[in-house]
Each structure stands twice: as structure tokens, then as C-alpha cells.
């Protein structure tokens, strides 16, 4: 799948955002290994800590469908430069994707930053850290 199509899918997802408090809609499109695209948008709550970001929504939809292998992620928002995922989203992305997987950060003006999972969260906490602790 080409990058532009994945970004277009993230823009479609953004249209579904539930953002009555921040008025800051974000969309994500997650490309699974089998070619399926999982859409995510941010979903706010009056108890702010219950809010879910677009990236995590896309991953949770895919994982709840039994999908564990992914090829790319695109995220979009109406920001000055390409939007950047929060720390919680970076950790979830790192949980399910290899470090070299491409992540496309963009905005509505068409600016695109291509990065990788490893660059988003160097030194991510992982299952290997848990394995080490269990061995002690």
C-alpha cells in the first residue's frame, strides 16, 4: 500500500473523533500484515484520564480482532508540523511492532515525517525486560 493511501485513511478516521473538550481530532490508520487497515480516532471523556488516543484505538481494534503483525502506521491532526504520538501511544506501538516499522506522522497541510518505531521510543520497555526480572 502506498503512503498517500494510508494517510488518506488516517484522515477518514479523524472524521470520527469524539473530541467535545479539546476540539483536537486525531486520526490513525494501521496497516496489518494481511493488508487490512484498522482505523482509530481519539475518543475523549469528561474524566480526561479515560480518553483514548487515535493510535491506541487503532491498535486495540486490531488486537481485539486477533491481529498481531503490522506493516505501517499513519497519524494525522491539524497541527503546525507533523503530529507526534504521546508517550503512552509510543509504548503501545512498540509493544506490537518491530523497531524498523515505518510510522508516518502528518498534518492537514500535507507535511509528512517518516520515522520508525525505534526512533519514536528508543529503549522501550519490553517483554525482554520482564523475562530478565522473572529469571532473578
From Swiss-Prot:
Catalytic machinery residues: 55
Cofactor dependency: Zn(2+)
EC number: 3.5.4.5
Chain residues that bind Zn(2+): 53, 86, 89
UniProt keyword terms in alphabetical order: Hydrolase, Metal-binding, Zinc
Record-level GO BP terms: cytidine deamination
Pfam families, per database record: dCMP_cyt_deam_1
InterPro entries cross-referenced by the UniProt entry: CMP_dCMP_dom, Cyt/Deoxycyt_deaminase, Cyt_deam_tetra, Cytidine_deaminase-like
SUPFAM superfamilies in UniProt: Cytidine deaminase-like
Catalysis: reaction(s): cytidine + H2O + H(+) = uridine + NH4(+); 2'-deoxycytidine + H2O + H(+) = 2'-deoxyuridine + NH4(+)
Transmembrane regions: none
Positions of substrate binding: 42-44
CDD domains: cytidine_deaminase (cd01283)
Gene Ontology MF term list: cytidine deaminase activity; zinc ion binding
Disulfide bonds: none
Function: This enzyme scavenges exogenous and endogenous cytidine and 2'-deoxycytidine for UMP synthesis.
NCBIfam families xrefs: cyt_deam_tetra (TIGR01354), PRK05578.1 (NF004064)
Family per record: Belongs to the cytidine and deoxycytidylate deaminase family.
Name recorded for this polypeptide: Cytidine deaminase
Organism of provenance: Sporosarcina psychrophila
Amino acid at each position: 500500500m502506498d503512503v498517500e493511501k494510508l494517510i488518506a485513511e488516517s484522515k477518514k478516521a479523524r472524521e470520527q473523533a469524539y473530541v467535545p473538550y479539546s476540539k483536537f481530532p486525531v486520526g490513525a490508520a494501521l496497516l496489518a500484515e494481511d493488508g487490512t487497515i484498522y482505523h482509530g480516532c481519539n475518543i475523549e471523556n469528561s474524566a480526561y484520564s479515560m480518553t483514548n488516543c487515535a493510535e491506541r484505538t487503532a491498535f486495540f481494534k486490531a488486537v481485539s480482532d486477533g491481529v498481531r503483525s503490522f506493516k505501517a502506521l499513519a497519524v494525522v491532526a491539524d497541527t503546525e508540523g507533523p503530529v507526534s504520538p504521546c508517550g503512552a501511544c509510543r509504548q503501545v506501538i512498540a509493544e506490537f511492532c518491530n523497531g524498523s516499522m515505518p510510522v508516518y506522522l502528518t498534518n492537514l497541510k500535507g507535511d509528512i515525517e517518516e520515522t520508525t518505531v525505534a526512533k519514536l521510543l528508543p529503549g522501550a520497555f519490553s517483554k525482554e525486560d520482564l523475562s530478565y526480572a522473572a529469571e532473578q
